[in-house]
Regions:
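Type III/flagellar secretion export determinants
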Residues: 1-198
Length: 198
């Protein structure tokens, strides 16, 4: 499993790579509704402790470990305002199982030139033309990947709340999550800078 730590806290879209064993999203790093029962004071205390550890970290291994802990805590912190990504994922999985009965539904690397030519001539309908409404309020869409096959996008609240483009699962933050993320990093960097400069 790989995770990018560059520019932590500065982007609205996160790309996280799933564990290779099951291909499922790594829910440790992806915010989803109802993930935590901690109080605001408990969160602030944990955020400050991680910022202090990060400010005092001396080697790359320790810094990477702290960065992973920060991302996990951030996912938990954002869960208060996050869409129910887990539920949407389960609904999308169920909808995709129904699509697998279609002989034209192919996985990564399985689209052929013939598939594209038939599509251009209007002889078949591919998944990229479909949008499937999910019970949780989201929409399941499929994208044709440049590597062949289909990627998956689960959209809700105007953003891709979960997506897989062949390299792993990622997500975009809703406006409420972006605000909450800024709040998280405001606490984090204030404490980090206080320790570094103190």
């Amino acid at each position: 499993m790989g995770i990018s730590f560059s520019n932590i806290g500065t982007v609205g879209r996160e790309q996280l790579i799933t564990s290779g064993s099951n291909g499922e999203p790594n829910w440790s790093y992806i915010p989803s509704k109802g993930k935590s029962t901690k109080t605001q004071n408990e969160f602030v205390s944990e955020i400050k402790k991680l910022a202090q550890k990060a400010a005092n970290a001396t080697d790359k291994t320790e810094q990477d470990s702290i960065s992973r802990q920060v991302l996990q805590l951030r996912a938990e912190y954002l869960s208060e305002v996050a869409p129910d990504r887990k539920q949407l994922y389960q609904q999308a999985k169920s909808a995709m199982k129904n699509q697998n009965t279609n002989p034209k539904c192919k996985g990564i690397g399985e689209l052929t030139l013939l598939d594209f030519l038939e599509q251009a001539e209007g002889k078949n309908q591919n998944l990229a033309d479909k949008q499937i409404a999910l019970a949780g309020g989201g929409t399941l869409k499929f994208t044709i990947l440049t590597s062949g096959g289909y990627g998956v996008q689960i959209q809700s609240q105007g953003v891709n709340v979960l997506l897989n483009t062949g390299a792993g699962w990622g997500y975009e933050m809703t406006p409420a999550e972006l605000t909450k993320k800024d709040e998280f990093y405001s606490i984090y960097w204030k404490e980090y800078n206080a320790v570094k400069n103190g």
